Amino acid sequence: MGDSNTLADDDSRVVADAQGRLADRSLHDHTERLAPNMYEVCDGVWCLVGNGLSNQTFLRGPEGIIAIDTGDSVEEMRSALDHLRRVTSEPVVGVVYTHFHYVNGTAALTEHEPITAIWGHERIAQNLERAATEIAPAYSRGLVEQFGIQLPDEGPDGLVNVGLGLAYRMAHHAPSTPGYVAADHTFTEQVTVNLAGLEMQVTPAPSDADDSVTLWFPHFNVAVHNLVWPALFNVFAIRGEEYRDPRVLLNGLDHLRSLNAEHLVATHGPPLSGKQELERRVTAYRDSIQFLWDQTVRWTNRGATGPELAHRIQLPAIYDEDWLTQQHYGLAEHHVRQIRAGLFGFFDGDPVGLLPLDTTDEAERMVSAMGGAEKVRRLCVEALAGTDNDRRWALSLAARLAHRPGATQQDQRLLADALRTAARRTTSANVRNWCLTRALDLDGSIDMSRLRTHRFGRRQVARWSLEAAVSVLRVLVEPDRLTGVDLHLAVVLDGERTGIHFRNHIACPTEGVDAEAVLTGPRDVWNQILTGSSDVRNAVDSGNLSIEGDTARVFQALAAIDHPGFE
């Protein structure tokens, strides 16, 4: 089907905006769709776009206003409330979460508005905790890279947009105070409820989150959803996420189509209206996802590897006619590889990936086999000046040079140059932001090292359950330090008990029953240890924590934790 046209051969489509930010022309055009605007969807329904990564939606019921999604911070939601007050003075009485991504501004409502109910999926709290504990460093690093959080505001590397919004967090919402308030009414399956005097039909519709729902308001003929975005749906998130099965997504899209809505209001992008227009556009959106899944299975059955899928499967030109299915967020070539991995795992049948060398070893050997570093550098410079697949070749060469143990600053700069070339020529905001963040890290403009270790914030730790605050140690174990160690430790903080069993080079979470030793003290002291403002030895020596049992064995076990609070 030819080139997907999402990574240009040259700079002919690259333009600079008024702030000097270099990007594909279509990505600049996409920014206009995400511009701040309080849309009046219909009488009594408003959607605020451009206030943050997500929209905030408001519906007027007989008993007051319903707010759907509260953004990423208290400041963001206060801004949304200010916009609401320009169109109505009616009180906000209900809150609904479409999924766990945009729930952090609710405190802005509960502190002043007469909220009677907060509705959300039962899994929201669990999903929030998962992202903030064991996988927190990788998750946070992925957010920084995908959403360009450390990119400058202007200049060639400046942030243009993040595909679904103008930015992950708007600068004028600093310091972006978290204000999550848990739902006091939850659902796990399809249900119809009355909120603010309005009938609201809730239907689970997993998309980029397994707790995502579609909300149908028959009175307004409006569906609020997390399915049809202002760009091709992101089966694969470059930041790293759990597998999003397109077959499940298709069920949600088919349900959305079946509503025959007059208005669709998404979590991202401008609202859409008109039954006939919606039927055509949502059907095409749905079919783009089926196309990717069907063709991935077709070519996988024929033996194609991941990279082969990326080049053989191209979205037909029809999908480039509507911005709903254009590749301004993720890329189809990544989505098909993710679908294959989701179905069959990481190994795609290529012997190269069966028993691979360590990255640095492979780079060293390949550079040597190609004639040495200087020759590879020349090849890389030539490729950067070329067209067609030369840009991909340049990235491959530069990465091998930079991965070598003896990599020089010149090698790092070459890789940064290759990444910047890809960044300005891609239509994908995700790829642009990722490439530029890595380039800035390589050339020393920013420092990402702090995001490659477990770093816990005070407010973050305070929100965890006791079980989460102790079981997180399992992913901090330096296994060699547990050689010969077998100790079951109970941890009792503020009278609440949990436990962890150090054995066989792991730390296994337990309930702390029948433990050989007990660590006791205030939860606040444990939080200080996790955040690095104290350490376990000093806490015990000062009497803030006490140990019942063999103190030496407890310290030996805890010393296996790769964290300054325990070493």
Residue ranges: model-predicted function:
Residues 35-88, 214-227:
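Conserved beta-strand hairpin/beta-sheet module of binuclear metal-dependent hydrolase folds
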Residues 41-47, 186, 197-201, 482-490:
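Short, hydrophobic/aromatic-rich segments at coil-to-beta transitions
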Residues 2-28, 136-141, 149-173, 258-263, ...:
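Accessory terminal helices/loops
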